Regions:
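Serine residues within intrinsically disordered or low-complexity segments
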Residues: 1, 5, 13-14
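C-terminal regulatory/effector modules of DNA-binding transcriptional regulators
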Residues: 5, 170-172, 178-329
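A detector for short, charged/polar N-terminal pre-domain segments
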Residues: 12-29
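Short Gly/charged-rich anion-binding patches and loops
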Residues: 29-30, 43, 76, 220, ...
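Generic structural marker for isolated residues within well-ordered, non-membrane alpha-helices
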Residues: 31, 45, 273
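Short alpha-helical "recognition helix" segments of helix-turn-helix
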Residues: 34
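Long amphipathic alpha-helical segments
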Residues: 37, 41-195
């Protein structure tokens, strides 16, 4: 991360400086680095500054925002709570200790304790930077469980546990990234063992809208659909709505599946879904999944909201039944 030292002082004394300028040599972290460290967009950070009075960055001599390390730690904690469905306005004024306590409660409620030995082993390997051993452990787990149970019973709780450890400061950013990459490899390797889907299989286009950077959720959905005989086409993350439309037509998609984390702006998601629905043929189904969908309080015409990851499997089976497709296709 790029750290700005705040060494540049205005030529006047501190008494004549504007309050917004840095008046001490303590380090500050620029907004781009904070965005990378926390996963919170620059726009969102500015909105919170106006709406909640937090964070309250200092300014360097050039007027650029500089965030303190303690603010970044708190922002990271809030982001992790947002990822499990907590609204930022409810926690933004709580202390870091209180945020950590709440995260611990949510981790327990979310079932991270269901595999305590596995969580302990995985965290130990991540901290030891033993990527090879971690990859082997995950591969063995996939073989023992099967892909769909692995996603629902292992990937989900492990991801929560690693996220909580990162939020508490027990893992560094690069260590969480190492875990995520290892999980990507395990899932992609398992998905690739399934045979090529025959002609007539449901074609599922998968992506996220701009500003949604979470890719693991897409891969988890693909891992649930592949054993059901779906032909999945992933565009990765952050695809503009118009490009989603073009890709759906080009790939002859039967279903467009979009993933939204809890932190994604609700209004932006709804507008994008409604725009996409209006410009795709009626026979192309649109699925919206992820934590954000729990906050949608009204029906979106022509859009299926799937807030529970496990609900992806029956959704595909229902789609097949309505179209008279054979169960394995």
């Amino acid at each position: 991360s790029r750290i700005r030292s705040g060494e540049c002082q205005a030529p006047h004394s501190s008494a004549t400086m504007k309050p917004s300028l840095v008046s001490s040599p303590s380090p500050g972290i620029n907004i781009g680095a904070v965005e990378r460290e926390t996963g919170l967009s620059k726009d969102l950070l500015r909105v919170w500054e106006r709406r909640y009075g937090f964070p309250r960055p200092a300014r360097d001599a050039g007027g650029e925002r500089l965030y303190s390390p303690s603010e970044v730690s708190k922002l990271r904690a809030i982001k992790r709570l947002m990822d499990v469905g907590i609204r930022p306005g409810k926690v933004v004024h709580q202390s870091l200790d209180a945020l950590h306590a709440l995260a611990g409660e949510r981790a327990s409620d979310g079932g991270a304790g269901a595999v305590p030995e596995l969580v302990r082993d995985v965290l130990a390997l991540v901290r030891a930077h033993d990527a090879s051993a971690l990859q082997h452990l995950l591969a063995q787990r996939v073989m023992r469980q099967g892909l769909q149970p692995f996603v629902l019973e292992t990937v989900a709780p492990l991801t929560r546990a690693v996220g909580t450890a990162w939020m508490r400061g027990d893992l560094q950013v690069f260590e969480e990234h190492q875990f995520t990459e290892s999980m990507h490899v395990a899932l992609r390797t398992a998905i690739n063992t399934f045979p090529r889907t025959p002609e007539g299989s449901p074609r599922v286009l998968m992506t996220t809208f701009p500003r949604e950077t979470h890719h693991l959720g897409l891969l988890m959905v693909e891992a649930l659909l592949a054993p059901e005989g779906a032909h999945c086409i992933s565009l990765g993350t952050q695809t503009p709505v118009e490009d989603v439309r073009r890709a759906a037509l080009a790939h002859r998609a039967d279903i467009v599946a979009l993933s939204f984390s809890a932190a994604y702006p609700l209004r932006v998601a709804i507008d994008g879904l409604e725009t996409l629905r209006a410009h795709l043929p009626a026979q192309v189904a649109i699925w919206a999944g992820g934590e954000l969908t729990r906050r949608v309080r009204r029906t979106l015409a022509g859009v299926a909201l799937i807030s529970d990851l496990a609900g992806t499997i029956p959704a595909l089976r229902d789609w097949k039944a309505r179209r008279g497709a054979p169960p394995g296709r």
